[in-house]
Amino acid sequence: MTRFLFTSESVSAGHPDKIADQISDSILDSILEQDPKARVACETYIKTGIVLIGGEITTTASVNIEKIARNTIQEIGYTHPKMGLDANSCVILSVINQQSPEIQYSINHDSDRTQQGAGDQGSMFGYATNETDVLMPAPITYAHRLIQRKSKLRKNGTLPWLGLDAKSQITFAYDENNKIIHITAVVLSVQHNKNIPLEALREATMEEIIKPVLPQKWLSKQTKFFINSGGTFTIGSPISDCGLTGRKIIVDTYGGMARHGGGSFSGKDPSKVDRSAAYAARYAAKNIVAAGLAERCEIQLAYAIGIANPIAVNIETFGTEKVLHSTLVTLINNFFDFSPHGVIKMLNLARPIYKDTAVYGHFGREQFPWEKIDKVDLLRNSAKI
């Protein structure tokens, strides 16, 4: 019996907000490559024919921001003015200041690097669940996989009529035990050229994108498919919508299945706890679930600006814990260092690894260090299970 429905969405690399995220993280990576201690907060705004880059950057690195932006736009595939953004001819404006000296002092006021303060106040969440192989919620996982499949088929020429812009959305039905029953609805909107009839597009999308991605066990006669349900989608990207860094925070995280502190990720160096603490919380939650200590785990971290350690750590397992809650609290406090310096060291974050995070989600992708499950044995042994 269905207890509730849950829906998550994803967007493609060519979506305007994701163009902005990729530019911001490409600039961050280029700076970190030269200066791992750089302080970067880089925001990007996109509209037809124009890119505006702003923020606060303090670094010894020398980078060509305009060139980085153009190269990123080129790699995404925007190479003609008719697309709304041309890597070669678009206007790129840059308004960059240095980080506030007061904030810089609050972070670095102590000569002991282990006492590096948080760059801001705020709360961050990390989440894991055993309902998928990557210990992520199924709705966001499969929404991302649809978009990844679409991107692959566009790039390899299998579906040459595909455009750069796309959005996916999946609704799952869950039972009273929070277990998946089936998929009730799939929404997929793909930009396309004018040469393909709508019905041919829908058939090809179903056969080449949807069916190879979604597990048959979760599909039924009741599953509804909405492929380009609004009709033709030939005008997209920066022509139809502006783009802005950090506007897809739910797509970037857990698709709404877990709570969110509100801070975005892209364009921020790891001294910003908005980003690094969210990664650390995911790392801890994933290891708790991978160790079999809980079926679902959400960890909240809270910080005060200039203070080295979190002012609050909370763990929620939704009644799925296999050991005492007090044991879980002890384990995460003993085996995970959530101070800003500790997080950067624990996950090796002061390096150029961020551009790849800007599309298809920051979590559930094994190439990132916060996805390691290297503390499983330690946790299990300490919990005596």
Curated annotation (Swiss-Prot):
Annotated residues for binding of ATP: H15, D165, A166, K167, D241, R247, K248, S264, K268
Annotated residues for binding of L-methionine: E56, Q99, D241, K272
Q: Which GO terms describe its biological process?
A: one-carbon metabolic process; S-adenosylmethionine biosynthetic process
Q: What is the top EC class of this enzyme, as a single word?
A: transferase
- Record flagged with keyword rRNA-binding: no
The GO terms describing molecular function are: ATP binding; magnesium ion binding; methionine adenosyltransferase activity
Q: Pfam families recorded for this chain?
A: S-AdoMet_synt_C (PF02773), S-AdoMet_synt_M (PF02772), S-AdoMet_synt_N (PF00438)
Write out the ranges of the annotated region (Flexible loop).
99-109
What's the cofactor?
A: Mg(2+); K(+)
* One cellular component term from this protein's GO annotations in UniProt: cytoplasm
Intracellular or extracellular location(s): Cytoplasm
Which Enzyme Commission number(s) are on file for it? 2.5.1.6
Which reaction is catalysed here?
Answer: L-methionine + ATP + H2O = S-adenosyl-L-methionine + phosphate + diphosphate
Q: Which InterPro entries match?
A: ADOMET_SYNTHASE_CS, S-AdoMet_synt_C, S-AdoMet_synt_central, S-AdoMet_synt_N, S-AdoMet_synthetase, S-AdoMet_synthetase_sfam
Output the PROSITE patterns linked to this UniProt entry: ADOMET_SYNTHASE_1, ADOMET_SYNTHASE_2
Q: Where Mg(2+) is bound, by residue?
A: D17
Q: Does the keyword Magnesium apply?
A: yes
Which pathway features in its UniProt record? Amino-acid biosynthesis; S-adenosyl-L-methionine biosynthesis; S-adenosyl-L-methionine from L-methionine: step 1/1
Task: Give the co-factor note.
Answer: Binds 2 divalent ions per subunit. Binds 1 potassium ion per subunit.
- Which purpose does this protein serve, as stated in its record? Catalyzes the formation of S-adenosylmethionine (AdoMet) from methionine and ATP. The overall synthetic reaction is composed of two sequential steps, AdoMet formation and the subsequent tripolyphosphate hydrolysis which occurs prior to release of AdoMet from the enzyme.
Mind telling me which HAMAP family this protein's record contains?
Answer: S_AdoMet_synth1
The entry describes its oligomerization and partners as: Homotetramer; dimer of dimers.
Q: What is this protein called?
A: S-adenosylmethionine synthase
Say which species the protein is native to. Answer: Blochmanniella floridana
Q: Which gene encodes it?
A: metK
